[in-house]
């Protein structure tokens, strides 16, 4: 099968990676192929259904593939690790999709690499299917994200903390896998030439319009800050908690990447944490905008030598961008909140209107997704909204203020903005448990709903319901991939 690889990272950035083969797997089996994505990439889904097990397990890579493990560093929970890198993933190449966009293809769970740090480099079935589901859920919500092209069972049992688990490999598609941590890797070694080469490559690939800017590296820093501020605002608007916002998990492209311990919040609480390793709540839902700025500061540090030859002037230039991050984020968040609330135009009191609703939701632990969805019905009838609040009168004073700001077509706009279906934790776990037992039908049904999250259907009612009382209080997620 022809993939038409054009591997610019391997060609232009020698020394930024290690050539490495995928580990052998005993009995690969294609579990799921993302046929719409395959077509978007200009690939033949029917042919991939037949040959995908061999290709996406790394057993028989297509002609032109160049498997490599990328080097990067990163701050993990605030502590700097000078060498991380692809410890269980291989970039196999780049292709141009039907829209003319360059896309990375990466095998995740393909075995040990020189960056594995003692781990086996493999991925278990559950985490692979989880990333597939959540990535497609984010895509359905219109949020920039990496996506899964395929999931392959390897036929190899893996020993994990919870016992023996079947092995699997995810084929991930991304605009690129360049991270803040990629810049940090070379900056930590004072290799300014490679920091510059990486910046030039990232500009050419993601922000080509900046190449002719008076100060292209400063413009690049600003563009990444803008892309990430918009991304995190969109996470917050759907109640998404990434769970591990380390600098090696922040892309230069502005895509969401690495769905290890992520989850969607149900009852609204800014302190919500699901990740089993986030013991201090560093990456709690409400902290994500602050971590956004913290991570961008680390990128700024790596770029300082490119911003100006004079250290003081370079710092001032970096700070001039950093000082805008809060306003950038708030602007995107407020614009999104106005859309969620169906407001007409923009008025000064809109932020207070939104914050007062959130305060009531927090006090009542109201479900994030259903509250905004049922507000569309509350334009004319609040009968389905009130039961979401323990005190039915909690919004008594707020509703008239909100209705006074509504656009004429508010209900229609709100239904197109506020999803009815998200990847609720209990439904994800049910689908994964069934998959472990050999039944992928629940996975497929959930995936179908998540691909069309704004269209409410009677036969999908179960996917809209919150978890049983107390489920999320004890629910924990893990870095499985």
UniProtKB/Swiss-Prot annotation:
NCBIfam families: PRK00029.1. It comes from Cereibacter sphaeroides (strain KD131 / KCTC 12085). InterPro entries: SelO. The lineage of its organism: Bacteria, Pseudomonadati, Pseudomonadota, Alphaproteobacteria, Rhodobacterales. It catalyses: L-seryl-[protein] + ATP = 3-O-(5'-adenylyl)-L-seryl-[protein] + diphosphate; L-threonyl-[protein] + ATP = 3-O-(5'-adenylyl)-L-threonyl-[protein] + diphosphate; L-tyrosyl-[protein] + ATP = O-(5'-adenylyl)-L-tyrosyl-[protein] + diphosphate; L-histidyl-[protein] + UTP = N(tele)-(5'-uridylyl)-L-histidyl-[protein] + diphosphate. Its cofactor is Mg(2+); Mn(2+). Pfam families: SelO. Mg(2+) binds at residues 249, 258. Keywords: ATP-binding, Magnesium, Manganese, Metal-binding, Nucleotide-binding, Nucleotidyltransferase, Transferase. Its EC number is 2.7.7.-, 2.7.7.108. It comes from the Bacteria. One of its GO terms (molecular function) is magnesium ion binding. Belongs to the SELO family. This is Protein nucleotidyltransferase YdiU. Nucleotidyltransferase involved in the post-translational modification of proteins. It can catalyze the addition of adenosine monophosphate (AMP) or uridine monophosphate (UMP) to a protein, resulting in modifications known as AMPylation and UMPylation. ATP binds at residues 85, 87-88, 108, 120-121, 172, 179, 258. The active site is at residue 248.
């Amino acid at each position: 099968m022809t993939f038409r690889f054009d591997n610019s990272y391997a060609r232009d950035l020698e020394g930024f990676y290690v050539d490495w083969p995928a580990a052998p797997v005993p009995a690969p089996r294609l579990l799921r192929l993302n046929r719409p994505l395959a077509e978007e990439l200009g690939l033949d889904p029917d042919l991939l259904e037949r040959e995908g097990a061999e290709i996406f397990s790394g057993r028989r890579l297509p002609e032109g593939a160049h498997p490599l493990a990328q080097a990067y560093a990163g701050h993990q929970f605030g502590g700097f690790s000078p060498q991380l890198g692809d410890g269980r993933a291989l970039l196999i190449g780049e292709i141009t999709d039907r829209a003319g966009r360059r896309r990375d293809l990466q095998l995740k769970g393909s075995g040990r690499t020189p960056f594995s740090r003692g781990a086996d480099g493999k991925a278990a079935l559950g985490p692979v299917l989880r990333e597939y589901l959540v990535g497609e859920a984010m895509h359905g919500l219109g949020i920039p994200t990496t996506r899964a092209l395929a999931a392959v069972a390897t036929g190899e049992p893996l020993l994990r903390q919870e016992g023996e688990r079947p092995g699997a490999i995810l084929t991930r598609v991304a605009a690129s896998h360049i991270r803040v941590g990629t810049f940090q890797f070379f900056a930590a070694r004072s290799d300014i030439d490679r920091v510059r080469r990486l910046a030039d490559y990232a500009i050419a690939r993601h922000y080509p319009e900046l190449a002719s800017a008076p100060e292209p590296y400063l413009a690049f820093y600003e563009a990444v800050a803008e892309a990430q501020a918009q991304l995190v605002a969109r996470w917050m608007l759907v109640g998404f908690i990434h769970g591990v916002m380390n600098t090696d998990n922040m892309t230069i492209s502005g895509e969401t990447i690495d769905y290890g311990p992520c989850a969607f919040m149900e009852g609204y609480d800014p302190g919500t944490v699901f990740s089993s390793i986030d013991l201090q709540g560093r990456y709690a839902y409400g902290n994500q905008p602050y971590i956004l700025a913290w991570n961008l500061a680390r990128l700024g540090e790596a770029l300082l030598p490119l911003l100006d030859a004079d250290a003081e002037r370079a710092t001032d230039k970096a700070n001039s961008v950093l000082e805008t991050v809060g306003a950038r984020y708030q602007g995107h968040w407020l614009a999104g909140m106005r859309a969620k609330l169906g407001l007409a135009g923009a008025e000064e009191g809109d932020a207070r209107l939104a914050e007062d609703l959130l305060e009531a939701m927090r006090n009542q632990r109201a479900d994030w997704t259903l509250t905004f969805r049922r507000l569309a019905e509350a334009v004319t009838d609040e009968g389905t909204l009130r039961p979401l609040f323990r005190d039915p009168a909690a919004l008594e004073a707020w509703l008239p203020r909100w209705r006074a700001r509504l656009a004429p077509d508010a209900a229609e706009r709100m239904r197109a903005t506020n999803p009815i279906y998200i990847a609720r934790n209990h439904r994800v776990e049910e689908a994964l448990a069934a998959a472990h037992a050999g039944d992928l039908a629940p996975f497929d049904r959930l995936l179908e709903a998540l691909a069309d999250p704004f269209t409410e259907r009677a036969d999908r009612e179960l996917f809209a319901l919150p978890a049983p009382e107390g489920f999320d209080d004890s629910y924990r997620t893990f870095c499985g991939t």
